[in-house]
């Protein structure tokens, strides 16, 4: 085989290097701007979380517990990747086993769309007492609703900062 050297080889080499450099340096900017799809999913999750909370709050005599905490946002990520979808999904799957509501299936479906990478399944310890189960469901539902409010604010403020 004959080796060709000349201006076309240098240009091709430069083009390949420049393309890789541009791709690696523009990627973080693209991640900071939430796509319309992610924002629509989070808006839908926010609406569904309100429906779930309203449904759960109809149970009289159940109070929120300080014993349960839903991990909401990942501290080391930027919007839209900062929603801790795998952990939230695990909690809602647990709630679905205790109280099978159709809205929970919808929420899990939307959360699946937000999981950008394979994450280990979070293990949730479930209370065994019936009343404590109701407190668990109410507490996690309330925290999930607050989380979606926070996530949507995070997305919209991140989008505004990216445009300025």
From Swiss-Prot:
GO terms for biological process: immune system process. Detected at low levels in testis, bone marrow, skeletal muscle, kidney, colon, thymus, small intestine and trachea. Residues 1-23 form the signal peptide. It is found in: Secreted. Its main location: secreted. Keywords: Cytokine, Glycoprotein, Immunity, Secreted, Signal. GO terms for molecular function: cytokine activity; cytokine receptor binding. Glycans are attached at residues 67, 100. GO terms for cellular component: extracellular region; extracellular space. InterPro entries: IL-31 (IPR027987). Induction: Up-regulated in skin homing T-cells of patients with atopic dermatitis (AD) and in activated circulating T-cells. Up-regulated in lesional biopsies of patients with allergic contact dermatitis (ACD). Activates STAT3 and possibly STAT1 and STAT5 through the IL31 heterodimeric receptor composed of IL31RA and OSMR. May function in skin immunity. Enhances myeloid progenitor cell survival in vitro. Induces RETNLA and serum amyloid A protein expression in macrophages. This is Interleukin-31.
């Amino acid at each position: 085989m004959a080796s060709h050297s000349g201006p076309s080889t240098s240009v091709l080499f430069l083009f390949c290097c420049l393309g890789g450099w541009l791709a690696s340096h523009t990627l973080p900017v693209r991640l900071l701007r939430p796509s319309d799809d992610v924002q629509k999913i989070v808006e839908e999750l926010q609406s569904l979380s309100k429906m779930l909370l309203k449904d759960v709050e109809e149970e009289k005599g159940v109070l929120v517990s300080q014993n349960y905490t839903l991990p909401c946002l990942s501290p080391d990520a930027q919007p839209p990747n900062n929603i801790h979808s795998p952990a939230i999904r695990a909690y809602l799957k647990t709630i679905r086993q205790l109280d099978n509501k159709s809205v929970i299936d919808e929420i899990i479906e939307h959360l699946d769309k937000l999981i950008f990478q394979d994450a280990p399944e979070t293990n949730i310890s479930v209370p065994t007492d019936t009343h404590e189960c109701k407190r668990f469901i109410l507490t996690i539902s309330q925290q999930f609703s607050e989380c979606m409010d926070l996530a949507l604010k995070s997305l919209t403020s991140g989008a505004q900062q990216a445009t300025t």
